[in-house]
From Swiss-Prot:
GO terms for molecular function: ATP binding; metal ion binding; methylcrotonoyl-CoA carboxylase activity. The modification N6-biotinyllysine is found at K665. ATP binds at K144, E228, H263. It comes from Dictyostelium discoideum (Social amoeba). This is Methylcrotonoyl-CoA carboxylase subunit alpha, mitochondrial. Residues 148-345 form the ATP-grasp domain. The keyword Ligase applies. The active site is at R320. Probably a dodecamer composed of six biotin-containing alpha subunits and six beta subunits. Residues 624-699 form the Biotinyl-binding domain. One of its GO terms (biological process) is L-leucine catabolic process. Its cofactor is Mn(2+); biotin. It comes from the Eukaryota.
Amino acid sequence: MFSLGKLVKKDAFFYRYITNVNKDLKIKPITKILIANRGEIACRVMRTAKSKGVKTVAVYSEADKNSLHVSMADESYLIGPAAAKESYLCGNKIIDVAKRSGAQAIHPGYGFLSENSDFADLCEREGIIFIGPPSDAIKAMGSKSASKDIMIKAGVPTIPGYHGEDQSMSVLKSEAAKIGYPVLIKAVMGGGGKGMRIVEREEDLEDGVESSKREATASFGDSRVLVEKYLVHPRHVEIQVFADRHGNCVHLFERDCSVQRRHQKIIEEAPAPHLSEELRKKMGDAAVAAAKAVGYVGAGTVEFILSADNSFFFMEMNTRLQVEHPITEMITKQDLVEWQLKVAESQTLPMEQEQLKIHGHSFEARIYAENPDSDFLPGTGKLAHLSTPTPSDTLRVETGVRQGDEVSVYYDPMIAKLVVWDQDREKALRYLRNALDEYHIIGLNTNISFLKRLSTHPSFMAGEVETGFIPIHRESLMAPQAPMSDDSLALAATSLLLKEITQQKSKEDPNSPWSSLGGFRINHNLKKQVKFNQKDNKVVVNVEFIGGGGAAANGKHNFKVTLDNGNVVEVLDAKLNQNNETISAHVNGRFYNNIKSVIVKDTLTIFNEGQQYQLDIPQDVKPKGADGVLGSLVSPMPGKITKVMVNVGDMVKKGQPILLMEAMKMEHTIRSPIDGKVESLPYNVNEIVEDKKTLAVIV
């Protein structure tokens, strides 16, 4: 169906693309690479490189000097201020670092310079391997109009549309009328949803075109647009392709990326639901033909629009590794970054098409700092608390941030990618929901709750996805948060008082706010009133301590909690766990295990029943040393543990050195505030500690 030989003979224009294969086939071992990127993709590339014994070099802006990718690299170099145009987009600076460090190759990641043909050319001129496609292929696919012409000549299906150079409004109106409404206005040099408008009626075309042109000019410096037929109820299905310099090209099956907001992907899955083997083969063959049409080398993604009648059309080709590549890795059991390194060394592809198989199902959920209730407005701020589900062979947390890091205004607000795999779609989706329940972030708005609602939506569970999924189901997806249950409120009040008990046991401080509370003593019945502010509502909870707390009870306590609605909740065997950041208890006969409850500044946040609730704490109730810290053995600033001088269970004296910590190029001695017993030492030698984290608990 797709004949590359006929294509070359038919049009000499394409011959220059084909010459990228079968040349310079001598294998060139790569021992050091520079990653010209930041965040999670830089960390992702480094992980594979290190596993293969390849040294890594990081570049960073002033805003990223303490970033995870900098600490992961074998070497790191400052390349400029925070603004990307003065750092990560400066090709000459990156080439200079590559030369200084002795890096033989540059991996561009995605974004920034990854699809910049001039940078690929610069690497070649400087004798540095660009881990990506040839510059000719980047140029060919970088223009939406030119790439569609190439696809038409290659026999790849394309959407009816106008891709001409005449940008006059009269011509655009005429072409739109020929195509038929609704139409999609797209920036010729666009990407990431920028410069894209849907126009339903002819009378709205002029406004849509002008708006698209303004956005295209601001984003890409090019105002040209194209007009395409807008397909109703379409799906966004993309094919992962890989090619080497020996003429081999394969596809690694498809990913469904239909669920989007602001024309940007938010959740992806592989394989695509409800796709027949026949259609899968047709789309895979078309993607390979598209790659061969431009002499492609390396990892690439061919994006298609799939209509309700299973006809599909070429949309664009991303000439880089995609954000969502991990789900392809999960279902094929292949490391695509490792494939990139092999191809960059002029090796052949590790596998042939017939050897590649689909195993199970995988989802990726993108966790963003954004507010879904405000049209997904991006946010910034400090990750005051961050805890994730435990990574494994079937669960990946792809991230470039740690607790205490800032989500900056300068870069994309993506915090992480949560990737799960299981034997089939139903099990994988259940796994994703459970993992989202274990993902806890405090300090800024995120889309985690939205992702939970999305993953439990009946239409999504049935695989009935399309690019308009979120607008269509907006009302149910944007439902207001459920009221806080009696159980959750009782757990919140109980956890706050347990932190108080731990505080009293850890340190009897005459200056502590607890010394003025009066009457609250372990093993004595006491009624205490706790006040919270939840948004605009004041919540009053009366808690009666009814026993427990002795050695025989293993630190468990019993409470009777009376809520302001008059309901009485019995909380038994309540105990703090995991560095005092979770609570376990029986509440009215139901057992809650390790419910996250964290204090940051003046707010207690509790994660329970799939919800995140924030309760402001009056100052007379807040435990001293809150922000998730109990007692006074806290890190004075971010740093590294260099020595631990005691063991759990040791008896220590007030002022005795407990551990040494290196921070800001100085060594700090952390001493015991009281005479007592070492109850916990959360950190080991050489571990990195964030600001204001508990280093030890003495009781």
